[in-house]
Amino acid sequence: MKGPFNLSEWALRHQSFVWYLMFVALLMGVFSYMNLGREEDPSFTIKTMIIQTRWPGATQEETLRQVTDRIEKKLEELDSLDYVKSYTRPGESTVFVYLRDTTGAKEIPEIWYQVRKKINDIRGDFPEGLQGPGFNDEFGDVYGSVYAFTGDGLSMRQLRDYVEQVRAEIREVPGLGKVEMVGEQDEVLYLNFSTRKLAALGIDQRQVVQSLQSQNAVTPAGVIDAGPERISVRTSGQFQSEKDLANVNLRLNDRFYRLADIADIRRGYVDPATPMFRFNGTPAIGLAIAMKKGGNIQDFGKALHARMNELTADLPVGVGVHTVSDQAEVVEEAVGGFTSALFEAVIIVLLVSFVSLGVRAGLVVACSIPLVLAMVFLFMEYSGITMQRISLGALIIALGLLVDDAMITVEMMVTRLEKGDSKDQAATFAYTSTAFPMLTGTLVTVAGFVPIGLNASSAGEYTFTLFAVIAVAMLVSWVVAVLFAPVIGVHILSADVKPHSAEPGRIGRAFNGGLLWAMRNRWWAIGITVLLFVLAVFCMRFVQNQFFPSSDRPEILVDLNLPQNASMDETRKAVDRLEATLKGDPDIERWSTYIGEGAIRFYLPLDQQLQNPYYAQLVIVSKGLESRTALTERLQKRLREEFVGIGSYVQALEMGPPVGRPIQYRVSGKDIDLVRKHAIELATELDKNSHIGEIIYDWNEPGKVLRIDIAQDKARQLGLSSDDVARLMNSIVSGSPVTQVNDDIYLINVVGRAEDAERGSPETLQNLQIVTPSGTSIPLLAFATVRYELEQPLVWRRDRKPTITIKAAVRDEIQPTDLVKQLQPDIDKFAAGLPVGYKVATGGTVEESSKAQGPIASVVPLMLFLMATFLMIQLHSVQKLFLVASVAPLGLIGVVLALVPTGTPMGFVAILGILALIGIIIRNSVILVTQIDEYERDGYEPWDAVVEATEHRRRPILLTAAAASLGMIPIAREVFWGPMAYAMIGGIIIATLLTLLFLPALYVAWYKIREPKRD
């Protein structure tokens, strides 16, 4: 009668086919490795949409009530909505739609469609004259390649012509996605009028505008069917240059005026300026290039570099092309570094195998590694997983685990060969005795990573490939151990294996002595272990908490926030002062400056800032990590001492979901003045803590407004309306569009405005002469009064409530999460004293960390259920399930021993490692308990079964622990993986020792096993 199916026995009977499978797997794995995409970090979805609307001429309050509030109300109908945030300026509304962090990436396109549909449904409710709404759901696009074009002796228009030329030519690069220009300034033809002169001539500026628009209009003149052909009729008159404008003769009030005689015509750039861009302090135009999704960044980078080199070689002298950001180079360095770490880990694991198992047995284990890696690479290619920080780190972590099964199989084969079995018998016995305990251990280990795989947050999406790669590697390693390793083993292992000496060595004797002491003094052993565990729990308070560490890239971000009523020109002057201190700094490779907006998203986790005239951001590339640290300290000191009154923040690039300033508190309520008052009080309270850095508000101070109160009855008698006066004032102060001039590929706006002397001072507005429809001129003060008042220029709201966010950096080495814990009693006390309807909420690092860890906590019960189910299938005993599971929490002892002395923080990734540690620990425990069962079935006394099983499984358990822990050494020095590696190394080492000492003591105590009396 045949026994149960034995996969190893089947493999030995079909060796040719198995060798063929191994060859195909290796070959396909090599090709997959070559085809895998390369990235610096895994992508994750930015679950944010921006809705922008303009209502020219409206006040901030009108825009808030009639536009922003209507949009926010409608968005509340979204099922997946987390919250709505908005800011409203006079005539401008910007609404941010944030989806719940657990929203799946595949659901988001449909949700954005629903947002557009809902807002379109209320278009009829918006006021007249509204422009938009416009939708931006491509907020997360990454422009990995950014070039700066500078022009020595060239105007901005001339430089832009060359940039446009390059932009058009690079379209042929394979894989090219979006291309954006940064810092370009649109040309404008200004018609600067003297209002006094126009009034003296009795000319209404609106007449001038109407005449120019009529002449420049593009109107069809018809088509003539002339027999066999069609002839289009064209009229002349369209403006092609400022000269055409200057020569226009206008008929106004039955007289002809040459435009150049009544207006000063100048070609310039839009004023006030749009966001500006600089490179190393020199005005520049940036060209930001994104790759299409799913491409290979290294291949794309090579093709782009080659094409850019061809194009820049043809540019004239004076045009400089500089690299601002090169993602392909960054990825090549990052992947190269991680690939080197992977090979280091392979060498370490192989050394462990050869030293512990011997050359032949170690060679069998060595052969299993490329087989597993090949099949994992194959899976990665077909599932769309690229080689990046997370997937390569997962491979390194998996490497120490995937050799476990092969080691156990080979060690069992060697043991049976020592007892005189043939190679085939040894291989089939290894399957019978270890295959299913190994499978259970593998499934339990994989279950430990389930919270990562099922975490739907942005952080979970960022780390998902950790679960996918490790899970597949573990499952494949079991297949290799039971299918391929026996076949390799029968060819490599020697049939004439000499038995090991029955007498244990010095280490073996010491271990046996410790084991027997623990079993004989079981309650002491259990008590000491429990005491150590309680001590470890207590010491967890000394472990600093962290969300994600800073990136190891050399860039530094410097934010400058001027008072919110500051002009773009004032911001530029502040930047000039800072850039003057950067020139010649030995720690700086290069820098780029964005004035009036934040840096374009050249790096996915960038906390991108919107356009604001009072804001600037510098991206400084240091010459290395040491230079980055020194430069950061110098900049912080300089900004604090020399840039008083300007909010500044210096930071390295972030990893994981973007946060910005780590300490954030939101104060919200109904009344803006009360919200401002409470926000200032809270900021004052925060400033008392010595660890709090510079504090800023996202909005606070009111701005000055010049209000013109029109006497409506007098205005109507003169034939004027409020609309007429508002349009006239706008054309005088800011300028109003008149028409456009076609200039090559550009459409240049012609803008009419008052001359500099008349629009440069608020006082001059009071003396303006207004031309009435009857042609007479009258001073503004004849029917209006002018006065100053304060108005809120900007209002941020969250979930339809005015909300001020207080933001601060952290001084010293304290982690933001720990600082928030320190502050919490004071915050609670402050919040308790607020009126009803006003509240304080914590944001920043703590909030983002909570969003990431919340989904993990919700999946932990499923993880425990899966582990318990797999264990019950293997053990068939609730009592043994308890014994095996009891060792898992004890890994915390090793975690604390590793983290506290080294000062390593506990971050999001370290938490994932600790959860995974549970499965790894249980894996060894279940193998030991299963071995005890086998010895008892073979007739051993219970005491002897525990002793023999522990001694028998000691070597493979220690070997797998050594491979798993030592294999993580290459990533322990990485900023990102270091905390996880330290936690897992410490946990594995201590838990392994406890598995071999505490578990036997607990086993004999639980089953009340006594040591038999010996004769």
Q: Can you say where each PLM-predicted feature lies in the sequence?
A:
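Hydrophobic transmembrane alpha-helices and their membrane-interface caps
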Residues: 28-35, 347-414, 472, 865-954, ...
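Signature of alpha-helical transmembrane segments and their immediate interfacial
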Residues: 1-38, 432-434, 501-548, 589, ...
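Helix-loop junctions and hydrophobic alpha-helical segments within the transmembrane domains
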Residues: 324, 331, 335, 410, ...
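Transmembrane alpha-helices and their membrane-interface boundaries in multi-pass membrane transporters
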Residues: 399-413, 434-454, 461-500, 618, ...
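Extracytoplasmic/periplasmic membrane-proximal domains and adjacent transmembrane bundles
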Residues: 10, 52, 123, 169-347, ...
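Solvent-exposed, membrane-proximal periplasmic/extracellular interface segments of envelope transport
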Residues: 5-7, 62-138, 196-217, 238, ...
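Transmembrane helices with small-residue packing motifs
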Residues: 16, 24-62, 106, 120-129, ...
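Solvent-exposed, non-transmembrane alpha-helical starts
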Residues: 20, 59-66, 103-114, 144-147, ...
